[in-house]
């Protein structure tokens, strides 16, 4: 699913960057300036003094924070933003960013004594490499430093690449570094999509799939409807599905296609009224402008990664005109 440029890309490499400093920002910007590409890339200090990348390609713009390797913006020229960001989001060390694309590993949901949704979304990732094709596609590669926070799991290595062009391509690789232990792994790209009105969209591609309904204490159900519509809180873990999912937004005249590989689960979530009011980093009315369609492997689809083996989760997000 990853795009292969027709000409060899150029790279801005060097030592990994994992924390903001004047020296590191200056050095990376100096390396980037030497790349021959129609795209523009700037490394700078963002909100909360968190380091971030701003990317502009011939097709689109994007923003990525090192904190969580978190994509907070992707917008095709002439189109509405693809990703939703809460106006109440925190930008601070140790807190997740609300919106965009949080990375969830090695567990999904809440675990007693461990917290919510793993460690990756609240950690500073290392910036490993930036590559630009001569046509303008930009690929940024990150790695997650080892942490004692995940000491209840066998040691693992995580790498993440983001390719920005006419589409947004994501690849999350997790390798079990243990020589003798299996790594139980839940992974998820918890993507928040911007929509005109959550009650007006339809989500297709999951008819006939079984799911766990978290709103009803994980009741097991089968989706018999042609499409999902949002009219109350929705929190569903769809299982054993590799299907492409589409978000149809008639008011924006847009369809978003979520293509994936290495994923057997799709999560669909909208917090609706009451849960929105309980979340301190989410606006009371913001549920009207977003829906999460998340790709990964969760619950019954938890992966068992053999010693020294790896899993690769890939997602491509495609935005096009509705009916085109």
Which ranges hold each PLM region?
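Beta-strand-rich recognition/accessory modules
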Residues: 2-58, 67, 77, 142-151, ...
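N-terminal onset of structured domains
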Residues: 48, 55-58, 156, 161-165, ...
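Acidic-aromatic substrate-binding/catalytic surfaces of carbohydrate-active enzymes
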Residues: 58-116
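Asparagine-centered strand-capping/turn motif at beta-strand->loop junctions
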Residues: 64, 172-178, 319
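Extended, loop-rich substrate-binding clefts of extracytoplasmic carbohydrate-active enzymes
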Residues: 114-165
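Beta-rich strand-turn-strand
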Residues: 164-169, 178
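Active-site/ligand-binding surface loops and adjacent short beta/alpha elements
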Residues: 180-267
């Amino acid at each position: 699913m990853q795009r292969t440029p027709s000409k060899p890309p150029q790279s801005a490499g060097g030592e990994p960057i994992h924390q903001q400093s004047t020296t590191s920002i200056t050095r990376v910007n100096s390396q980037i300036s030497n790349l021959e590409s129609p795209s523009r890339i700037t490394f700078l200090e963002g909100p909360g003094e968190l380091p971030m990348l701003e990317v502009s390609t011939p097709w689109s713009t994007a923003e990525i924070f090192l904190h969580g390797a978190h994509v907070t913006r992707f917008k095709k020229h002439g189109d509405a933003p693809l990703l939703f960001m809460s106006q109440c989001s925190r930008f601070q060390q140790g807190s997740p960013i609300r919106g965009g694309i949080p990375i969830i590993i090695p567990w999904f949901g809440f675990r007693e004594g461990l917290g919510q949704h793993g460690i990756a979304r609240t950690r500073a990732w290392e910036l490993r490499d930036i590559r630009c094709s001569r046509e303008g596609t930009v690929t940024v590669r990150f790695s997650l430093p080892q942490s004692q926070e995940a000491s209840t799991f066998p040691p693992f290595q995580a790498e993440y690449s983001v390719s920005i062009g006419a589409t947004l391509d994501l690849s999350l690789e997790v390798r079990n570094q243990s020589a003798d232990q299996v790594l139980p792994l839940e992974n998820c790209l918890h993507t928040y999509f911007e929509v005109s009105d959550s009650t007006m969209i339809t989500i297709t591609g999951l008819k006939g799939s079984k799911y766990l309904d978290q709103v009803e204490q994980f009741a097991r159900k089968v989706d018999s409807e042609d499409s999902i519509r949002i009219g109350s809180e929705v929190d569903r873990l769809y299982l054993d599905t590799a299907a492409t999912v589409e978000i149809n937004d008639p008011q924006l005249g847009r369809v978003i296609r979520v293509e994936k590989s290495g994923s057997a689960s799709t999560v669909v979530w909208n917090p609706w009224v009451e849960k929105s009011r309980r979340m301190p980093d989410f606006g009371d009315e913001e549920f009207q402008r977003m829906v999460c369609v998340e790709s990964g492997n969760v619950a019954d689809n938890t992966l068992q990664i053999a010693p020294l083996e790896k899993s690769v989760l890939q997602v491509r997000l495609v935005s096009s005109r509705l009916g085109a």
